[in-house]
Amino acid sequence: MLTDMEISRQANVRPIGWIADDFGLGKHLWREAGHAMAKISLEAARAPLRGKLVIVTAVTPTPHGEGKTVTTIGLTQGLHLLGHKACACIRQPSLGPVFGVKGGAAGGGYAQVVPMEVMNLHMTGDIHAVTSAHNLAAAAIDARLFHETRLGCESFSAKTGLPALNIDPERILWRRVVDHNDRSLRQIELGLGDNNGPVHGGGFDITAASELMAILALCENIADMRARIGRVILAMSRDGKPISADDLGVAGAMTAIMRDAIEPTLMQTLSGAPCLVHAGPFANIAHGNSSIIADRVALAHHDYVVTEGGFGSDMGFEKFCNIKSRASGIAPSAAVLVVTLRALKANSGVEGDDRARLEAGFANLHWHMQNVMGYGLPLVVAINRFPDDAMAELDWLKERCLEEGAFGCEISDAFSHGAEGARALATAVARACDAPVNFEYLYDDEMDFGARLMTLAERYGAAGVSLSEDARRDLAMITELGMDKLPLCMAKTPLSISHDPSLKGAPSGFELPVVGLRLSAGAGFITVLTGKVMTMPGLGLLPGYLNIDINDKGEIIGLG
């Protein structure tokens, strides 16, 4: 079989204007961003919603993923093949995983967004806009600290006419960001050298973990984005008051940098189905879903909209339900859970023959099935087939899924056969979308912080929760600010349902260690840091960039 790059290169990429016409967008609602991309006006999101939203999730993945994006794109192509008007909504890839271990995020095989190298490398620069806006705030808070320290607060106010913020250098909360995996930047010292400001600690996160990325994904329009950015808390004053981006006077400039990034980007799949690519928060350290705006645009113009939540259902799907859907008010009509035989065996935690490993690993799939169905959604299990999968094992898995209450279960060959390989899956999903839905959140808005945290922990299988001293201090600050009722965004390993990647299957009886809390007042949630999770990834022993180069024709090679 050809590589993803070779398949993408051989694709008949249609002019993006044709895709926009099929989408149903008048010329005033989009503008070209090159031959293969278009930016969509926010006006396109104002039409009444007509479509049904399908959320794609997965079992606990192996490090290379189980084909969730392949399934999302393949399912969209399959629905398109059946004559339905269908659109995919996915996140913009971060350069971190592209050059790290996982590779690109455009799908794969014959279920791709094309051109894949355009999607995986920069696209329309939205992530860079988020990076620039975020780091402008970081520069502004340090500059204000420098000048107030140099002049003294009274003299600063007299010279500038601005109120002194009296920033506490030990309580600057706003870390810098960059769109790469770089562990050396996790903890740094700022202000070193003569006349560079008071020395204080800091660090970098990956841009996908930026609160601005979450705001981009959760806002409804430009005014909402501006208001949310203004509420972002950058630091605390020496007398314990929060200092927001509006207080610093930088929120307007930050929004200006992100003005064009708020518009979703229209691309196409190999079969010519439309795909909206917008925002890129990670699911393990952020809320892990594409934008509300993209969903609204797609739902206003299509019968079916297929989106995905990052990693397993304990990660992106949970946040889709409790953060994104809560913010948008849009409930999904059905869910698709992607599983592979490889993932079941990897999640078994045992050695032995394949059947024994499958039996043990099924506990993980069973947990994810119960988790998804617990939100009141019809569930279709998609078995993503690999070339060496044994048919007897696939049949066994399909039968078990149906026995455990799945609305449907189909083998997907989208990777190898594109739309035709997802025909059966698309048929099952269309049927599921007509089934009764009783969608509900996992916790109520009025539950206190401890009750909401324990509800999530118990869903993971934990017997209890422990808060470190840092986490308790963070909670005291958040409570004092009156923001302890915000939804929770769990930051943890994606390689286990628990906080510990070594706990396979469906662990239970463990204690969930909370090591810190981060308030995202603009995005509207509290990030709960657990275990040894890092908000800045690192490159591995054999990173993906080793495979990437450019040939004499100027073509990128080795990507994917």
UniProtKB/Swiss-Prot annotation:
It holds the Pfam family FTHFS. It is an enzyme of class 6 (ligase). SUPFAM superfamilies: P-loop containing nucleoside triphosphate hydrolases. PROSITE patterns: FTHFS_1, FTHFS_2. The keyword Chaperone does not apply. Keywords: ATP-binding, Ligase, Nucleotide-binding, One-carbon metabolism. It comes from the Bacteria. The keyword DNA-binding does not apply. GO terms for biological process: tetrahydrofolate interconversion. Signal peptide: none annotated. ATP binds at residues 62-69. One of its GO terms (molecular function) is formate-tetrahydrofolate ligase activity. It catalyses: (6S)-5,6,7,8-tetrahydrofolate + formate + ATP = (6R)-10-formyltetrahydrofolate + ADP + phosphate. Pathway: One-carbon metabolism; tetrahydrofolate interconversion. This is Formate--tetrahydrofolate ligase. It comes from Shewanella amazonensis (strain ATCC BAA-1098 / SB2B). The lineage of its organism: Bacteria, Pseudomonadati, Pseudomonadota, Gammaproteobacteria, Alteromonadales. The gene is fhs.
